[in-house]
Structure formats: structure tokens, C-alpha cells
Amino acid sequence: MKAAVYLGKEQLVVQDVPDPTLADGEVLLQIHACSVCGTDLRTFRHGDKKIIPPRILGHEFCATVVESRAPDANVKVGDRVVMYIVIVDGRDRYVEMGRENLTAHRTTMSYHHDGAFAPLMRVPAPAVRQGNLFKITSNISHEHMSLAEPLGCCMNAHSRLGIGLKDTVAVIGAGPIGMMHATLARLQGAQKVIVLDNNPARLEMAKRFDIDAALLVQADGSHREQVRALTEGFGSDVTIVAVSAAPAQNDALEIAAKAGRVNFFAGLPKSNPIAPLDVNHIHYKELVISGSYSEKKSDFQAAFALLHSGRFPADKFITHTLPLERINEAFPLMENGVALKVCVLPLVNGH
């Protein structure tokens, strides 16, 4: 079969690889759609020490079970599925807390096991035993269901933000993750949702969503005053940083209202993770700061249920689809703000 194989920095090559074969307890999936994640882009541009080449990438997917050597699995041949991609291989305090994303005893699809930028993907036996495959029972499209994984990551952040009816929410970053945060905030009843970005093209796409303002980040910092003007001078009750940039983290502290909640959803590059922050904002405004990394299984379940409900506007997120052979075209589309979410269709041939 053809697969998109990561060979190292700036090397994602579509090449022939053997079809996967199953051991006892494993399941084989036929991949219908796999969305390109920001981490795929980051891995392509900068590499990732956790990924040992050669590795088939892709972890945001929708598929059908085509073979099973797991008679006790919660899914069967013919079922359409999505997958919680964190596989626990031990137990510690975090697993006991239901925070599988934080345990050191885990592996992940696309990092430690071959992923879904291919027509077929093998699901390891531990993932099958742990019930990581979720059967789709609605007629929602393959492309839309591929959003379950990134949406679950956003759910993880929202689980600790407590967004309510009187809250103003500011999201810094108008990429697909930022717009998922903005959409979730509105679904949770936020009275005002403000999105900020330094890319005008992204802000134009953001205006297609149910938000109150799309603000261009300015070098002189005037966007901060715009946030205050939109919030009667108070600032944002909840601020989510959905972009990997230290200035955005500082902006979040600046625009946060007193007693506000701030979530650093996006981390900084490991090569330069230190940010100069005015921590007096945290002290004097009594801010509550949280981080967010990956997702718990409960977050994925919540995202799965939301997509199933039809209440999430998945159609606004998938702006481009590509056959597997053209996967490398996704990266400049994402970087330039032309695309919001690019979905790769491994079963579609063509150039």
C-alpha cells in the first residue's frame, strides 16, 4: 500500500510499504479520512524526538473495521469508528485519576505506532482491550468525524475553565484549534466571544463562525485596548492561548479581567520554552492559570458525543481535502492561513 512516511525533518514521503498484518487481539482499520494536525506540521518542519523514523504519521481519523483478531472487542468488522489514540501500558496515580494523558506509561498512535496517513492501519491489542475504538452510529461524514481527536483536546482545556453565561471569552489564535475553542465557548453559553490573530486571512475565515469580534494583533499592542473596549474596560473573563508564541502568552495576562481564568493550550517550542511574562498580572488580578496537554479519554468521549449530536459546526472546519499523494501540499496551506483544516483521503486516487 501507499503511505505517508516520516523519514526526518522536511521529509514526509508517500511510498510503498507492506500492508499491516495482525497479531492476536488486534484490529485492522481502513482509513477513510485523516485530518492534518498542527503537530504533523510541526513534526515535518522541526522534527520530533519522540518519533523514530520511519513512521507513518496521522492521528485524527475516521475508519472502518475490515479485519479483527479480537473476538472480545467492543467493535466488529463493518463498524465505522474513531479512536482515542493514547494507549496506556501501565498504572500509576495519573491513570487512577483518569488522566491518561499525563502518565509516563503510555504510547500514542502516529508517535509510537504507525498512523493513519495510509489506506490501512493496525490497532495494537492494548488499545482494543482498553476500548479505545468508538463505533459511529450516525451518518455524519468521515471528514467531520476525523475532528473528534482535536476537539477532545479542546474539551480537556474547557473542563477546567468553567465557562458560563456571563463570561466573555478571548481566544488568541484563529487556527482550527482556536476556532474550536471559540465554538465550544459559544456552545457553553459565553455572552461574548473574541478571537485574535496576526494573520488577516485567518481572521477572515474566523468571521464565518458565531463570534462577536475578530481582532488583528498589532505590534503596538492596540489590540489589547480593543479587547478592553469590547468588555466595558474589564477584559476577558476567560482567555485561551491557542498559538505557540510567547508574546501571545503575555497578551493573555494583559487582557485578562480581574479574577479571570487563563489557559495556555499551546506550548512553546522545546528549543526556546522560556517566556518573559509580567507575573504581576497574575498576582494583582488574582488570575487562575492552567495548562492543557493532549486529552483524557473522557474528553474524547465528550467530543465524540458532541459531533454525534450535530450541534458542532464541523462543516465550517474542513476547508480542503487532498488525496494521499498530495499530502505535502497541506503544510503551506496551513501555514499561510489559506486552509483551516486539511483532510487527507487515503482511498482517493488522483493528482
Predicted features along the sequence, with ranges:
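NAD(P)H dinucleotide-binding glycine-rich loop of Rossmann-like/cofactor-binding domains
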Residues: D89-I172
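Residues in the short beta-alpha loop(s) of Rossmann-like NAD(P)-binding domains
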Residues: N199, L268, E295
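Short N-terminal strand-loop motif that marks the start
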Residues: M1-F61, M121-G131, L347-H351
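C-terminal hydrophobic helical "lid"/dimerization subdomain
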Residues: N250-E254, K296-H351
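Glycine-rich cofactor phosphate-binding loops and adjacent beta1-alpha1 units
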Residues: L161-G162, E204, F209-E286, G350-H351
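Mid-domain Rossmann-like dinucleotide-binding core that forms the NAD(H)/NADP(H) cofactor-binding site
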Residues: S138-A219
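Short glycine-centered segments of the SAM/dcSAM-binding site in methyltransferase folds
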Residues: R80, T168, G260-R261, V288
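Glycine-rich beta-strand-centered segment in the early N-terminal region that forms part
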Residues: P20-C34, G47-R93, N101, T137
